[in-house]
Amino acid sequence: MLPYRFGNDGEVREEHLFAYLSVAAAYSHGTEWLDQVVGYIKGNVDFTETYLKEHIPAIKMIRPQASYLIFLDCRELGLNQKELNRLFVEDAHLALNDGTTFGKEGKGFMRLNIACPRAVLEQALKQLEQAVVNL
């Protein structure tokens, strides 16, 4: 086997010894860490759901089945997609994925990544809450 390969963009890629060792260590000794991360992310899902119900009831959350990405149903806000993007980016200062990126069914939705410290998530939701209040 060659010590290098070509990437999709035509660039030469070199496999690094530490990458192999890291993967081996993760598979051999990563169960406890993974369990903790999964538990923390589940806590962030619950936190987001509660926060939205209590503070931004016009935005509903679609509970993820096996992900740290949450779709926010913002259709009750009555905004078109351009206005919705402006609300998130310019008013709330948040960079989420536009739901229409995933097809026309995503109109009125935004996708939120909750794989972050809870304090960061809480701050983001507070910024969103303030932006919605100011509509």
Give the positions of each predicted feature.
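PLP-dependent class I/II
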Residues: 1-135
